[in-house]
């Protein structure tokens, strides 16, 4: 027999199909009345409002310009950030100037066009960086196999690849993630980020997932010159990527547990200078536990970098991050710790901590972040309007290779306002 709540959802679904502004107002009034009568909880009402808004938006964006286009969905993200960071270099009074600045972190607008026979395309542009975040064509062959071709991130690193920038709980990604995946500057490895290539994705009902990719070896943005670029001897060998994961629901559907590993082999992308015949291998293992209001996440990175430390010395940079959160109502305290050992290659504060000054080149970097998230509109899964703030502190130490004692520290405040749609 149907419950009252089931009937309510069915009624709201019927109203939703009508898709007019007047009906949307009626929906809101009806939901408010059901909350007052105790038929719906505040959280259930919030979820229903979000679902109705999403479905109404999707129906408005559907078009019949061609009978082969089934749906066109528009999405977007605005992130406005303020940061105040103070850097202190041991043994000198000539410290870098304090960073005290506000800026637009991301301004993204995306379009997904879905066609008949499970073909689709996705374009996501970031006006903040004047570059594409994704641009690819997708074909779903069956519930198990999906093929993507174009421009997107390489499948390496849980925090980097699987957790959207809009869902980061500590505002920015960890120092070790940034050191491993962001562009090679002679210190960072460049073992991730955006690539041109082909991705093959798979999944089965048991929770097992896998993903394989073949891409150009170098990380790139998409500009007008990329459409005619032919490559060079230093980057004409493909890079190979793989990720295998497993996700399981916990008892009584109170949470989930996810674990997996990722791997990347990048020919000619190792060493201090790209294209010199030195190869780079990166990998990670990760776990993500969500139980009720609590979450615990972590990841370990490792690498083999030919001539990564110097012209005569390889390096095996490694590190980890771990983060815990606890959701209470609309608020979510966050604590995260990360550590990076460059193994003689070198790392600066700014290589791992966004917006920080360099502080000099050292061998190891440690970071702590203490903060909180306020989900103003939406919840942890939807986060349409979110305010984040926190205190962070970091320390880089020791001279690479020689191990001579040296140190630089940074600490300060970071906040970000975000709107997703």
Could you tell me what each predicted segment is?
Residues 62-220, 236-252, 320-345:
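Outer membrane beta-barrel
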Residues 61-64, 185-187, 229-231, 274, ...:
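Short, P/G- and charge-enriched loop/turn segments at secondary-structure junctions
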Residues 40, 129, 368:
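Glycine-/small-residue-rich active-site loops that bind phosphorylated ligands and cofactors
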Residues 51-53, 131, 157, 306:
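Short secondary-structure boundary/hinge segments and terminal tails
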Residues 231-237, 278-280:
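Interfacial loop-to-helix transition and helix-capping segments at the boundaries
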Residues 213-232, 266:
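Active-site-proximal beta-alpha loop/turn segments in soluble metabolic enzymes
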Residues 2, 10-15, 19-79, 88, ...:
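N-terminal periplasmic/intermembrane-space "pro-region" immediately following the signal or transit peptide
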Residues 86, 95-96, 135-140, 168, ...:
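Outer-membrane beta-barrel pore domains
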């Amino acid at each position: 027999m149907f419950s009252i709540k089931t009937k309510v959802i069915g009624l709201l679904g019927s109203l939703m199909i009508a898709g007019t502004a007047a009906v949307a107002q009626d929906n809101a009034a009806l939901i408010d009345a059901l909350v007052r009568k105790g038929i719906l909880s505040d959280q259930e009402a919030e979820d229903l409002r979000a679902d109705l808004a999403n479905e109404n938006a999707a129906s408005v964006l559907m078009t019949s310009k061609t009978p082969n286009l089934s749906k066109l969905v528009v999405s977007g993200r605005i992130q406005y950030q303020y940061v105040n960071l103070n850097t202190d270099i041991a043994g000198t009074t000539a410290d870098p100037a304090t960073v005290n600045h506000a800026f637009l972190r991301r301004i993204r607008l995306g379009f997904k066009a879905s066609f008949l026979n499970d073909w689709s395309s996705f374009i996501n542009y970031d006006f903040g960086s004047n570059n594409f975040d994704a641009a690819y064509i997708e074909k779903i062959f069956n519930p198990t196999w999906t093929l993507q071709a174009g421009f997107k991130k390489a499948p390496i690193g849980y925090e980097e690849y699987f957790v959207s920038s809009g869902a980061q709980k500590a505002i920015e990604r960890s120092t070790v993630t940034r050191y491993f995946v962001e562009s090679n500057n002679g210190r960072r490895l460049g073992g991730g980020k955006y690539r041109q290539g082909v991705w093959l994705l798979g999944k089965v009902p048991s929770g097992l997932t896998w993903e394989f990719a073949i891409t150009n070896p170098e990380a790139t943005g998409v500009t007008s010159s990329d459409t005619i670029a032919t490559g060079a001897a230093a980057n004409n060998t493909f890079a190979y990527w793989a990720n295998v994961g497993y996700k399981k629901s916990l008892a009584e559907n109170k949470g989930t547990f996810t674990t997996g590993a990722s791997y990347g082999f990048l020919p000619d992308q190792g060493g201090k200078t790209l294209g010199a015949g030195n190869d780079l291998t990166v990998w990670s293992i990760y776990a993500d536990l969500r139980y009720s209001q609590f979450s615990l996440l972590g990841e370990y990175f490792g690498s083999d970098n030919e001539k990564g430390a110097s012209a005569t010395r390889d390096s095996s940079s490694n590190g980890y991050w771990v983060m815990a959160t606890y959701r209470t109502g609309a608020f979510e305290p966050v604590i995260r710790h990360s550590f990076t050992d460059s193994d003689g290659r070198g790392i600066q504060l700014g290589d791992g901590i966004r917006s920080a000054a360099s502080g000099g080149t050292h061998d190891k970097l440690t970071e702590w972040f203490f903060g909180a998230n306020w989900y103003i509109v939406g919840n942890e899964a939807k986060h349409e309007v979110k305010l984040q703030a926190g205190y962070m502190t970091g320390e880089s130490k020791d001279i690479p290779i020689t191990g001579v004692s040296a140190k630089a520290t940074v600490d300060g405040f970071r906040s970000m306002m975000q709107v997703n749609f």
